[in-house]
């Protein structure tokens, strides 16, 4: 009859007409204009981050006191901004009001490569953030690893060295400073930040404030092992302060 058809084309048109349409994502006809918002530019309390590094040699002496037995020893590293400032020939000038050390990295690798080290022993590294770290400069032989029981201790092999990151903590007493009459006050602004002044403060001892610290233990090897040690500090400075005018 007229108006009816059993062909495939007619069935497809009827099904397409009454079927639920697919939901499509709206396509913008015109390109949207970019809106430029004015960024806030702070003129005070700007924070500048600098990376400071230094390298030195460290040796683990061979065992001579108890040959044939396994003995351990330990050492530690603390951080001070003054250790990273070069005095000669070009002394560094820090024209900032305050600073704080946000992150530190210690890396120690054997100078001859790990293939040349004939020792397979391992020790541990641990972050110690109080004055107790000074106890780990051992001189007497230890029959057990003194850092293995510490929370957060990590194993390192004497033939490969290690690399470890930590957040140093400023010391709050004056016993660890090079001079006893220098103050190590923190000038805490809040519970989370501790800015140490550079320009003022008692005796201007800001750069000499010690920061704790990482301790590392090692088995005493049968031969002396020489390492190259690299320390890296990520230091934040604020409030750029140029030189004072002459009076």
Curated annotation (Swiss-Prot):
Molecular function per GO? DNA binding
According to the UniProt record, one GO cellular component term is:
T=1 icosahedral viral capsid
Give compartment(s): Host nucleus; Virion
Recorded source organism is Beak and feather disease virus (BFDV)
Task: Indicate the quaternary assembly.
Answer: Homomultimer. Assembles in the nucleus, presumably in an immature form, then migrates to the cytoplasm once assembled as mature virion. Interacts with Rep; this interaction relocates Rep into the nucleus.
What is the documented function of this protein?
A: Self-assembles to form the virion icosahedral capsid with a T=1 symmetry. This very small capsid (17 - 22 nm in diameter) allows the virus to be very stable in the environment and resistant to some disinfectants, including detergents. Essential for the initial attachment to heparan sulfate moieties and chondroitin sulfate B of the host cell surface proteoglycans. After attachment, the virus is endocytosed and traffics to the nucleus. The capsid protein binds and transports the viral genome and Rep across the nuclear envelope.
Is Nucleus among the key words of this record? no
Q: Where is this region: DNA-binding?
A: 1-40
Q: Where is the stretch described as Nuclear localization signals?
A: 15-44
Q: Which domain of life is it from?
A: Viruses
User: Which UniProt key words apply to this protein?
Assistant: Capsid protein, DNA-binding, Host nucleus, Host-virus interaction, T=1 icosahedral capsid protein, Viral attachment to host cell, Viral penetration into host cytoplasm, Viral penetration into host nucleus, Virion, Virus endocytosis by host, Virus entry into host cell
Family recorded in the similarity comment: Belongs to the circoviridae capsid protein family.
Where is it predominantly found? host cell
GO terms in the biological process aspect are:
endocytosis involved in viral entry into host cell; viral capsid assembly; viral penetration into host nucleus; virion attachment to host cell
Pfam families named in the record: Circo_capsid
Q: What is this protein called?
A: Capsid protein
């Amino acid at each position: 009859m007229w108006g009816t058809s059993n062909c495939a084309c007619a069935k497809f048109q009827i099904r397409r007409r009454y079927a639920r349409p697919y939901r499509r994502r709206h396509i913008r006809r015109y390109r949207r204009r970019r809106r430029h918002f004015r960024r806030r530019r702070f003129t005070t309390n700007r924070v500048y981050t600098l990376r400071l590094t230094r390298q030195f040699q460290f040796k683990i002496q061979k065992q001579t006191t108890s040959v044939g037995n396994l003995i351990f020893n330990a050492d530690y590293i603390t951080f001070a901004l003054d250790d990273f400032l070069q005095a000669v020939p070009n002394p560094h000038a820090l024209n900032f009001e305050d600073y704080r050390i946000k992150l530190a990295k210690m890396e120690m690798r054997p100078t001859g490569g790990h293939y040349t080290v004939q020792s397979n022993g391992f020790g541990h590294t641990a972050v110690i953030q109080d004055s107790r770290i000074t106890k780990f400069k051992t001189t007497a032989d230890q029959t057990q690893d003194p850092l293995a029981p510490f929370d957060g201790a990590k194993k390192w092999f004497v033939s490969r060295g290690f690399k470890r990151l930590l957040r140093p903590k400023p010391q709050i007493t004056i016993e660890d400073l090079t001079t006893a009459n220098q103050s190590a006050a923190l000038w805490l602004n809040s519970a989370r930040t501790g800015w140490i002044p550079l320009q003022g403060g008692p005796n201007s001892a800001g750069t000499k404030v010690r920061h704790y610290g990482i301790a590392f233990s090692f088995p005493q090897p049968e031969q002396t092992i020489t390492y190259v040690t690299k320390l890296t500090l990520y230091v934040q400075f604020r409030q750029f302060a140029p030189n004072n005018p002459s009076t």
